Structure formats: structure tokens, C-alpha cells
Design a protein with these regions (language model features):
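CheY-like receiver
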Residues: 111, 120-153
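Active-site beta3 strand of CheY-like receiver
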Residues: 44-50, 55
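Two-component/phosphorelay signaling modules centered on CheY-like receiver
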Residues: 11-29
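Acidic catalytic/metal-coordinating carboxylates
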Residues: 32-33, 59-62
């Protein structure tokens, strides 16, 4: 069965995401370097890729280019502690599905589950979208991460 591929050099961070996703019934493959990630993709194309922007042996942005050369539709989430404004436009241009702040782990977990479910059910996801935040409390709901998100997202 295809897996969610998590690529991050933080073992603790990867372990937490992996346990959450496995508990939800999704198989997970982890890699701490781009070399390991390339080997995992050679073995089997994943359901979803979630890749850190900065890895010991290269950039998640460059790995995005490699993945897009092989598969234009595969959901690819770039996750980083950096300010998204610094890399989001470039990631969008290169074909990233979503850019996420690693510190919003609960939201990232939910997005990974959403994209994995869409892949398994054959639903098409938008090629790129931003998470929208609504200033009017009338259209908001409290998120598990402590912020507000627009209803219906």
C-alpha cells in the first residue's frame, strides 16, 4: 500500500507525525535526508510527500523539482520553521501543493490526512491553495491549534 512520505532531519518531529498518522490508519515512510527520500520514491511513489525546506544534504525546494519531473500531480507539502513569505511564491511556482509552518503541527497533521484521503479516494485537490484566516468572528471556528480558521475549510 502506498505511504505518506515524511522527510525531516528532526527525529522527534518525524516520530510525532508518524505516530499520529499511523494511529489514523495511514502507512508512513520516513526519511531524514534527501538521499533516503530518493530511495523511498524509487521503491514506491508515495500518497503524499511532506518535506522540510532545509535538510542536511540539500533543499526541499530542489527535491520538489525532482518529484515534479517524475509526477506533476503528487501532493507535495513543504514544511518549515521559516517565514512562509520567504519561500512560498517560489514553492508555488515550482509546483508545491501547500506550504505549512512546522510549528502548527496539528494543522499539518490534518492536512496530511486530508491529502492522503483524497489520493486514496481519487479526489482531485487544488494545485495550490493558501489557508485563509477570517477576521470576522461570525465566520470563524476555534481550531485545535488555538487559532481561528474560516468555517467550511
Amino acid at each position: 500500500m502506498k505511504k505518506i512520505l515524511l522527510i525531516d532531519d528532526s527525529d522527534t518531529y518525524t516520530w510525532c507525525l508518524q505516530k499520529y498518522l499511523q494511529h489514523r490508519g495511514y502507512p508512513v515512510k520516513t526519511a531524514s535526508t534527501l538521499k533516503e527520500a530518493r530511495a523511498a520514491i524509487q521503491e514506491e511513489m508515495p500518497l503524499v510527500v511532506c518535506c522540510d525546506l532545509d535538510l542536511p544534504d540539500g533543499s526541499g525546494m530542489d527535491f520538489l523539482d525532482e518529484v515534479r519531473a517524475a509526477d506533476k500531480e503528487l501532493p507535495f507539502i513543504l514544511a518549515s520553521c521559516h517565514d512562509r513569505d520567504d519561500y512560498e511564491q517560489e514553492a508555488k511556482r515550482r509546483g508545491a501543493t501547500l506550504c505549512m509552518d512546522k510549528m502548527k503541527e496539528l494543522l499539518l497533521q490534518d492536512k496530511l490526512v486530508e491529502y492522503a484521503y483524497r489520493q486514496l479516494s481519487g479526489e482531485k485537490a487544488p494545485t495550490f491553495h493558501k489557508l485563509l484566516f477570517c477576521p470576522c468572528r461570525r465566520y470563524q471556528r476555534r481550531s485545535a491549534a488555538g487559532g481561528y480558521a474560516a468555517k467550511g475549510l
